[in-house]
């Protein structure tokens, strides 16, 4: 390839800065979605008819997975990765949404929370049964239900009305679903009902969230063997699943057949390579001499088949250089990226690594330091980690844990240095929650720190002190002992 001019280098950086994170899968445009999407064997397992629970953090690719199956080419590629033939034929399958915060078809958080007050999980089983019927009724007629029950299946019908009608016509509701499952079985068809964003049904009230989720899990735990062709897919955040004791034996019945969406470094670099190479012809030309093994797959574009993490080293080093400075002691760029984007549990989200490359490219565009053929200077990469940190913490507050803003404000008031003695951090986390509208499930300093460690924000070192990964330093206003001074 001819040597790039400065203008072409600037164009390459501009393209990398727009490589396709768009903040979240929900906001990505349809055009070119499959060219950015990387189907994985784990995704195929999640579509297996026997898998009920899909565990993954926000940003781990759950939404992308179910967006991909809306495209025939996407579903077909995912099915090719399946082992054992557990993924049903897409032409004989319907995928419905059992709960989502999008649109007006499902109860808003405040309504759900208010309804669940004073209720037991057994009560919530009835409301989830009603919502299942409502979901099915939108796309097909539900046979032999009383007129009063059908009226309650309208999205405009209040939850208390739906609850009361299900109570009154419980046998008819189950009989109708039994008949539907029989019809599906005779015609060799499937209906999958998906439940996502469940943490938002009562994001600000942990007690109500427990009750609501227990109702859903108990309902499907009791009925997943009753219906062979009417199948649920329940997406749970990892921290909710890890608190499995809160759900008792109900989860254990369905947890044996579960899929966990975990991204290995190989898969993260494969995703990055696919997005970069398929984004623009100029980027493909830039990486042409160092591209890992791959093949063209129709609407998916170029698909990386190189099996090991090491296979992607040359591609990353062409863009980022070999070292994070002038000397090897500064660390190798290839391993530095994943190490500095991981949380306290050792996990890296695909959303984070895409934002990292976008951010580093934008920073480099504003102040070019890298020498050709390198595009990203190590200072731009370090600054990009801070950007990812801020956006990740903001995302946690906005989409996952509204109470995390209080934790952030508390830490930013003192900028504690890590590593820190556990008792000292527990003392800092003694917060008066009495006036807070949204509270964490654990409010003592000890309990809150334990929760933050479960979430990967902090982790326990071998010497007993508490530390935080770089992913959360800037976002929470933390400082690292012996590290570069931060201008807080």
What is each of the regions a protein language model found here?
Residues 1-52, 72-91:
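A short, basic N-terminal segment
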Residues 2-11, 226, 311-488:
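C-terminal leucine-rich, beta-strand-based interaction scaffolds used for sensing/assembly
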Residues 6-9, 50-51, 56-192, 201-207, ...:
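P-loop NTPase nucleotide-binding core
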Residues 31-51, 172-175, 213-216, 252-253, ...:
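Short linear interaction motifs
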Residues 68-71, 123-138, 270-277, 355-362, ...:
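Short, hydrophobic/amphipathic alpha-helical patches that form generic packing surfaces
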Residues 69-72, 113-114, 209-211, 247-254, ...:
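Short secondary-structure boundary/capping segments
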Residues 198-330:
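The catalytic "switch" region of P-loop NTPases
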